[in-house]
Amino acid sequence: MKYGIVGYSGRMGQEIQKVFSEKGHELVLKVDVNGVEELGSPDVVVDFSSPEALPKTVELCKKYRAGLVLGTTALKEEHLQMLRELSKEVPVVQAYNFSIGINVLKRFLSELVKVLEDWDVEIVETHHRFKKDAPSGTAILLESALGKSVPIHSLRVGGVPGDHVVVFGNIGETIEIKHRAISRTVFAIGALKAAEFLVGKDPGMYSFEEVIFGGE
């Protein structure tokens, strides 16, 4: 598979290149603040950079008819509309978290909340001091799995890649469910799984859950 990275020189960009190269995939497109280096035609473009970069990413995907794996957070409606339009021409996977564990947790929460429907629920998320958006896209994703609005507490400290705790409470007992990303590698592994999934797919919007669970 030939692939491109938007945000190539960033921390996630470097992690993505490392994981993809270990699987023998060829990097043919590099995009960062210094410009664009085009070495070939990618099958898939991976972008974990910023919402501001999305117009250029969309332009490149259209140019090369390349699928898009998008892990950028803090997207606005205008960005989502760009993706909907792009998905008419190429396959797209967009997710706020490419950790397989988080997406398994999301599915689990959607079932658990049916049993604990009268319990209090709150979410606590912790990320590194450089993360700009709060609450995190992942916390919002987990809230959506609960099917209702719940309090979300955001901490920005040190170099934490990502901790999410969902707390259920009732009189006399609590349940805490925690997911911890130990390194950014987990997100790069998820991006790889999504990129390989997209190769040969028809145009359209695909969820990361479809990548993991198939058509279930």
UniProtKB/Swiss-Prot annotation:
Its EC number is 1.17.1.8. One of its GO terms (cellular component) is cytosol. GO terms for biological process: diaminopimelate biosynthetic process; lysine biosynthetic process via diaminopimelate. (S)-2,3,4,5-tetrahydrodipicolinate binds at H128, G137, T138. It comes from the Bacteria. Keywords: Amino-acid biosynthesis, Cytoplasm, Diaminopimelate biosynthesis, Lysine biosynthesis, NAD, NADP, Oxidoreductase. It catalyses: (S)-2,3,4,5-tetrahydrodipicolinate + NAD(+) + H2O = (2S,4S)-4-hydroxy-2,3,4,5-tetrahydrodipicolinate + NADH + H(+); (S)-2,3,4,5-tetrahydrodipicolinate + NADP(+) + H2O = (2S,4S)-4-hydroxy-2,3,4,5-tetrahydrodipicolinate + NADPH + H(+). It is an enzyme of class 1 (oxidoreductase). Gene3D superfamilies: Dihydrodipicolinate Reductase, domain 2 (3.30.360.10), NAD(P)-binding Rossmann-like Domain (3.40.50.720). Pfam families: DapB_C, DapB_N. Its main location: cytoplasm. Pathway: Amino-acid biosynthesis; L-lysine biosynthesis via DAP pathway; (S)-tetrahydrodipicolinate from L-aspartate: step 4/4. One of its GO terms (molecular function) is NADP binding. Catalyzes the conversion of 4-hydroxy-tetrahydrodipicolinate (HTPA) to tetrahydrodipicolinate. This is 4-hydroxy-tetrahydrodipicolinate reductase.
